[in-house]
Amino acid sequence: MHSDFFKNKVVAITGGSDGIGKALTDALLLQGARVATCARNQDKLYDLQLLHSGKPLHTMVADVSNYNDCKNFIDSTIRVFGEIDILINNAGISMRALFKDLEVDVIEKVMGINFFGTLYCTRLALDSVIERKGSIVGVSSIAGFRGLPGRSGYSASKFAVNGFLEALRTELLDSGVNVMWVCPGFTSSNIRNRALNKKGKSQGESPMDEGKMMTSEACAAHILKAIEKRKRTLVLTFTGKRTVFMNKLFPGLADKLVKRFFFKNGEL
């Protein structure tokens, strides 16, 4: 049984064409929200429009690492729907390579999408969200609590997102706006398949068993419940919670366990 919390609310989601972003879009439209989403893949956005024909869905092709694309997305959302109640910064990209092998512009690309995309969209939507006493959400990662080997740039980008949102939350404490970040833990999505290698190209495969992970749909349901409850943070999956807990209380042991988890026979 769905609540009416999201009914008629305007929700802007970055990266809504697949994975967690698409699951959020699907669920929100089902619950009566008006949804705007952007992504880089025009074909997937077109499929999304077909799937939700007749529903209040606004889509736009945009690369969130580009400020003007973010401006066009946020401005057009307000033009179409009149306001933004909730902004979900979901667009993200990962990487997998040892830092010593890495070309530095790979990290710049990851920071551009994960951190600056969140920064740009939040700044552009902020006045409307404050006016509506709404919510700003960042889809972060366990890598934002604990640096992960082979994912130095990804970890840096998610630590940056968490720090930025924590500072913003404190600034907005008396404004009626809720600021939350979500760490999905290990959730089945395309982020690992599309993770950049040391040269900045997509890996094309996941090093993990995606079938054993939480589904994007289950993750989206948890996120929406947390938005409704106006939570500060949401850490999902047992592995995710355990990693955060261990890193806080036993950081030295966490180093060893994390290394063992990510390295097999000395290889990433």
Predicted region positions:
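Conserved glycine-rich Rossmann-like NAD(P)H-binding loop of the short-chain dehydrogenase/reductase
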Residues: Q31-L48
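Active-site helix of classical SDR
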Residues: T122, S157
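Conserved glycine-rich cofactor-binding loop
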Residues: V10, S17-D18
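Substrate-binding pocket helix/loop in short-chain dehydrogenase/reductase
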Residues: L98-F99, E103-K109
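Residue(s) in the substrate-gating loop at a strand-loop-helix junction
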Residues: S141
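SDR active-site lid
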Residues: D174-F238
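The beta1-alpha1 cofactor-binding region of Rossmann-like NAD(H)/NADP(H)-dependent oxidoreductases
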Residues: V61-N72, V104
